[in-house]
């Protein structure tokens, strides 16, 4: 796990996003923006923050790092997986396909808190169930 280098800017970037989210919340509470606008701005802020953390991770990851070399060569993994391992998981979708406003701020190296763990596990379980159902459907259609 020592190969997964957490970017030092991560906490600053998350704190900056929290400040922006608080400003959006104040605008919403004053009635200056609608709930849909608040939702869209919140999602945009967290997507931008996740991208910034990913960029900081890529910039701080040494080129001779084993994890980086595997992803860069295409042998195993991708930068998205490295982002989840050492950056931040980011935004996830609920069962209806809508993006949840609260991102998973932690990564697998730091460890997820209980809420982040259950949200993440639910998404993984749903993905496995969907795959199993699609496999059964395609098998039936080949008859």
Language-model segment annotations:
Residues 1-143:
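Append "with occasional cross-activation on large, charged helical scaffolds in nucleic-acid assemblies
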